[in-house]
From Swiss-Prot:
Entry GO CC: cytoplasm
PANTHER family: IMIDAZOLEGLYCEROL-PHOSPHATE DEHYDRATASE (PTHR23133:SF2), IMIDAZOLEGLYCEROL-PHOSPHATE DEHYDRATASE HIS7 (PTHR23133)
Name this protein carries in UniProt: Imidazoleglycerol-phosphate dehydratase
Chief localisation class: cytoplasm
Annotated organism of origin: Pyrococcus furiosus (strain ATCC 43587 / DSM 3638 / JCM 8422 / Vc1)
PROSITE patterns assigned to the protein according to its UniProt record, in alphabetical order: IGP_DEHYDRATASE_2 (PS00955)
Length: 176
């Protein structure tokens, strides 16, 4: 999956061994954790002008790539409560064709290069690309690195469940 704009050029390949090289070391670290807990190999490369554009467009492109790789019938829902040292973060996902994101975390902007706005842009982009509802809620913690990493790991775990093949369409309507 490729997304090219005047602000970014991003390639996401799911199921391919390789590196995650976005030229943003924090995002690389978070995406590596996400991929591990998702249980999928992925290769990601990116160039960008602003970090805001990078985090948002990576989310969109990753969501589109995940959507493209969904089985015909899939579990749809996934949840995780992810601890990381002082942090405890709840993540809930519904791949429902209804994009929405709620990111409720309390971190100090610019602590170690982390910003709430970047996490929110990534999650909103992921929700749009995957066409999913995503909720992330910080239950405890103060360290920005731990909170954001717990969120990315939790997203991976929740999506690992939500994207698993199912025997039926997981909707009382019969269609998502």
């Amino acid at each position: 999956m490729r997304r090219t704009t005047k602000e970014t050029d991003i390639i996401v390949e799911i199921g391919k061994k390789g590196e995650i090289k976005t030229n943003d070391l924090i995002l690389d670290h978070m995406l590596t954790a996400f991929a591990f807990y998702l249980g999928k190999d992925m290769r990601i490369t990116a160039t960008y002008d602003l970090r805001h554009h990078l985090w948002e467009d990576i989310g969109i492109t990753l969501g589109e790539a995940l959507r493209e790789n969904l089985p015909e019938k899939f579990t749809r829902f996934g949840n995780a409560i992810m601890p990381m040292d002082d942090a405890l973060v709840l993540v809930s996902v519904d791949i429902s064709n209804r994009p929405y994101a709620n990111v409720d975390v309390n971190i100090k902007d610019a602590e170690e290069g982390f910003a709430v706005s970047l996490l929110k842009e990534f999650v909103w982009g992921l929700a749009r690309g995957l066409r999913a509802t995503i909720h992330i809620k910080q239950l405890s913690g103060e360290n920005a690195h731990h909170i954001v990493e717990a969120a990315f790991k939790g997203l991976g775990m929740a999506l690992r469940v939500a994207t698993k093949e199912s025997e039926r369409v997981e909707s009382t309507k019969g269609v998502l």
